Amino acid sequence: MSEKINANQDNDRQITLVDEQGNEELFEILFTFTSEDYGKSYVLLYPAAVSDDDDVEVQAFSYDADADGDVTSSDLHEITDDDEWNMVQGVLNTFLSDDRLSGE
C-alpha cells in the first residue's frame, strides 16, 4: 500500500458541501492523499464550526484532482467499497497517531 499524505499544503483550505436539502456547510481540509492501490485521490474533512472541546466527525471522499492536484475545484465521490473504506480509515488512524503528521 502506498499513500502520500499532504497535511501541510492543505492548511487553511475550506470546502462547502451541500446536502440533499440544499443546506450548505463549511468544512476544513484535514489532509489529502493518493492511493496507488486504488488509483484515486482522497480528501478528509471536518466541520469548520467546531470548537477544540467538541468531538469531531471526519468525513472522507475520493476526488478527481485537477491538473494541479487541487481538490477545491473538483467533484467529491462517496466511498462505497468496504476495502477502500478500511484503507482510508487506516490512513486516518496513522495520521491521528503520528504527532509529526497531525501537528500535535
From Swiss-Prot:
Stored InterPro entries: EF_Hand_1_Ca_BS, UPF0473
One family name in Pfam for this protein: DUF1292
Domain of life assignment: Bacteria
Sequence similarity: Belongs to the UPF0473 family.
PANTHER family in UniProt: UPF0473 PROTEIN CBO2561/CLC_2432, UPF0473 PROTEIN CBO2561_CLC_2432
Protein name, UniProt field: UPF0473 protein LJ_0477
Native source organism of the sequence: Lactobacillus johnsonii (strain CNCM I-12250 / La1 / NCC 533)
